[in-house]
């Protein structure tokens, strides 16, 4: 077998990439989110041997908030896939090097992984994040009294998150790692969250808070939520509406992606009193032009993974 060569992706690679991702990831990775990116070919590096494509890596430019109140240009790395026949040859390391060379003016690089040892030799270091609260769940009271008509439900789909954009941005101003979402980021979030329930808390004609959640078997998952500053009652109303749906679905445990803020913890003590904060160490960073500034409360939600 010849050594793999690494190059930029081409339009003719799309079918082979989908096949690679279907076998390299568990569960299989759908190309839907990648297809949203109009610049996906320029952002993707592939490895090719004499049997065809045997590896891929995706480097997406993102703007993430930092602890000094600034915004970092970040090279977000994902879809690192190596075919079975090409493993054990250092190909993942070569793919990482290739995408870093294409990072342009990015300040630093970010990835999330369950196998951090693969990336340490490329200069990446892990960091911790209190991203979720998890544990047993049960509906404590007949909630949602008075929320009917103020909390509107719909399934997440194309364009459904447009009404909540302002709420998201204003709620994330002090959260380290939280992306400043552009149109592409919002479209990708709609793909990642597709099919989950979007709960919007309405005050008059204004959205003052929202949540995206779904039951997965007996597990209730809160994927993303936000309320306008000072609208703490909206958070309680959203959780009350979610509780009604989860009770009907037979949810017995929960995983809640909420930042470690006092107002969030207060609401969760009533919603899921037995759930506890989890330490997420799947994130890794590497300096490019400079080191990342990640001091403070960190938060990154499912809609922004890449």
Place the predicted regions along the sequence by residue.
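Active-site/acyl-donor-binding loops of N-acyltransferases
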Residues: 125-142, 223-232, 240-306
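Conserved beta-strand in the GNAT
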Residues: 46, 52-62, 74-76, 81, ...
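Extreme N-terminal starter segment of soluble prokaryotic enzymes
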Residues: 2-6
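Active-site rim helix/loop that mediates acceptor-substrate recognition in acyltransferases
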Residues: 18-66, 176-198
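Conserved acetyl-CoA-binding loop-helix of GNAT-fold acetyltransferases
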Residues: 79-82, 88-101, 232-244
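Conserved GNAT acetyl-CoA-binding A-motif
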Residues: 96, 101-114, 248-260
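Amide-forming acyltransferase catalytic core, primarily the GNAT-like/NAT-type
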Residues: 125-226
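Long, hydrophobic, well-ordered secondary-structure blocks that form the structural core
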Residues: 108-134
């Amino acid at each position: 077998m010849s050594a793999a060569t690494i190059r930029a992706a081409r339009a003719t690679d799309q079918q082979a990439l989908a096949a690679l991702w279907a076998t390299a990831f568990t569960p299989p990775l759908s190309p839907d989110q990648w297809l949203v990116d109009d610049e996906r070919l320029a952002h993707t590096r592939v490895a090719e041997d004499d049997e065809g494509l045997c590896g891929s890596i995706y480097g997406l430019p993102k703007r993430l908030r930092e602890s000094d109140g600034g915004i970092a240009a970040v090279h977000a790395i994902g879809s690192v896939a190596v075919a079975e026949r090409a493993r054990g040859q250092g190909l993942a390391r070569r793919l990482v090097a290739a995408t870093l060379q294409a990072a342009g003016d990015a300040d630093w690089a970010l990835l999330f992984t369950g196998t951090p040892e693969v990336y340490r030799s490329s200069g990446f270091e892990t960091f911790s994040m209190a991203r979720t609260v998890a544990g047993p769940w049960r509906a404590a009271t007949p909630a949602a009294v008075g929320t009917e008509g103020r909390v509107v439900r719909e399934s997440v789909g194309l364009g459904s998150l447009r009404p909540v954009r302002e709420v998201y941005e204003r709620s994330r101003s002090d959260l380290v790692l939280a992306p400043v979402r552009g149109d592409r980021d919002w479209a990708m979030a709609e793909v990642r969250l597709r099919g989950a329930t979007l709960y919007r808390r309405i005050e008059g004609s204004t959205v003052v808070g929202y949540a995206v959640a779904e039951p997965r078997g007996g597990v209730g998952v809160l994927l993303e939520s936000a309320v306008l500053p000072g609208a703490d009652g909206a958070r309680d109303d959203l959780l009350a509406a979610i509780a009604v749906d989860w009770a009907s679905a037979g949810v017995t445990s929960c995983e809640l992606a909420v930042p470690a803020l006092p107002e969030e913890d207060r609401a969760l003590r009533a919603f899921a009193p037995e759930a506890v904060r989890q330490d997420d160490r799947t994130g890794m960073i590497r300096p490019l032009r400079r080191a990342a500034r990640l001091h403070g409360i960190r938060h990154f939600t499912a809609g922004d993974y890449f």
